[in-house]
């Protein structure tokens, strides 16, 4: 998620002002495609937070690193390795869903993600995740 309702910095500072950086192991999301590239660590994350509907702070076509991954998880296709463990109702009808990764992502899931990024950015290798 990358909006004023939910983003990585909101999660990181969830207990402010009492505790700053409450979640020390959270990694920042790659919000802007051409600036940040593909988040290679995505496939190793133990927990994933996805908002429904997907949250953007810019045009969705400039934030495919948010949209493609979130849509793939929300669809549930080829990602049997994710277990929905908690949901939170946020402002403006947004639901934050917390998933726990129970195993590796399937080759089909990785291939689907790789193809979508390659189609969107054929000339930008930094946005071509490995399909494995």
Language-model regions: role of each:
Residues 1-4, 8-132:
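C-terminal luminal/periplasmic domains and tails of membrane-associated envelope-modifying transferases
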């Amino acid at each position: 998620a990358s909006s004023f309702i939910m983003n990585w910095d909101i999660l990181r500072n969830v207990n402010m002002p009492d505790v700053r950086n409450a979640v020390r192991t959270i990694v920042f999301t790659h919000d802007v495609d051409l600036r940040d590239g593909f988040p290679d660590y995505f496939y190793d994350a133990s927990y994933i937070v996805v908002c429904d509907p997907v949250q953007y702070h810019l045009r969705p076509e400039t934030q495919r690193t948010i949209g493609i991954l979130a849509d793939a998880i929300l669809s549930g296709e080829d990602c049997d390795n994710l277990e929905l463990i908690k949901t939170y109702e946020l402002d403006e009808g947004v639901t934050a869903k917390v998933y726990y990764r129970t195993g590796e992502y399937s080759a089909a899931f990785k291939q689907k993600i790789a193809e979508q990024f390659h189609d969107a950015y054929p000339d930008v290798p930094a946005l071509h995740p490995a399909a494995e």
